């Protein structure tokens, strides 16, 4: 599903643990790390897409996390010219994303990268809050900075409510 401007609707998922560290996934067969993300299907809300992608890419259920916040508006990034598939119609020039900040309620053992035949990630780590901005592929750095800046204000919700169901 590509919009009229050539952007694919997508959700980005930032998972924070009790120590304030973020889930950081190593892409399969690549020397690249990123947050979980995925497309929003037709007739699917961004939040529904988050929980589907969370299960597909990280193996977590909605009960394993708490939604702490989301970006108010879509954030966009353009793909580098060499990654644009001009033979595909409609042509996708980038992604527009709603980002969600999720607090991890479960233990790390619940994380399972092998829920799909072809997993998105082959490894993962907990990293400091701002590490992803400098370490994601360059064309995503601005969107990561925008999302982390906007969602940082929601971090307090995780610790002030503690992990009470």
UniProtKB/Swiss-Prot annotation:
Its cofactor is a divalent metal cation. Gene3D superfamilies: Nucleoside Triphosphate Pyrophosphohydrolase. Residues 6-149 form the Nudix hydrolase domain. It is an enzyme of class 3 (hydrolase). Accelerates the degradation of transcripts by removing pyrophosphate from the 5'-end of triphosphorylated RNA, leading to a more labile monophosphorylated state that can stimulate subsequent ribonuclease cleavage. NCBIfam families: PRK00714.1-4 (NF001937), PRK00714.1-5 (NF001938). This is RNA pyrophosphohydrolase. The lineage of its organism: Bacteria, Pseudomonadati, Pseudomonadota, Gammaproteobacteria, Thiotrichales. The gene is rppH.
């Amino acid at each position: 599903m590509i919009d009229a401007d050539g952007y694919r609707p997508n959700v980005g998922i930032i998972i924070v643990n009790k120590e304030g560290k973020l889930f950081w996934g190593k892409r399969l067969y690549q020397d690249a790390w990123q947050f979980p993300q995925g497309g929003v299907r037709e007739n699917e809300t961004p939040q529904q897409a988050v929980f589907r992608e969370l299960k597909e890419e990280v193996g977590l259920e909605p009960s394993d996390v708490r939604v702490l916040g989301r970006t108010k508006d879509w954030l966009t990034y353009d793909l580098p010219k060499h990654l644009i598939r001009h033979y595909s119609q409609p042509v996708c020039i980038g992604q527009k994303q709603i980002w969600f900040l999720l607090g991890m309620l479960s233990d790390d053992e619940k994380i399972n990268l092998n829920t799909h035949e072809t997993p998105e990630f082959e490894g993962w780590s907990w990293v400091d809050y701002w590490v992803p901005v400098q370490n994601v592929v360059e064309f995503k750095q601005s969107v990561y900075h925008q999302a982390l800046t906007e969602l940082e204000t929601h971090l307090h919700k995780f610790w002030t409510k503690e992990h009470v169901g």
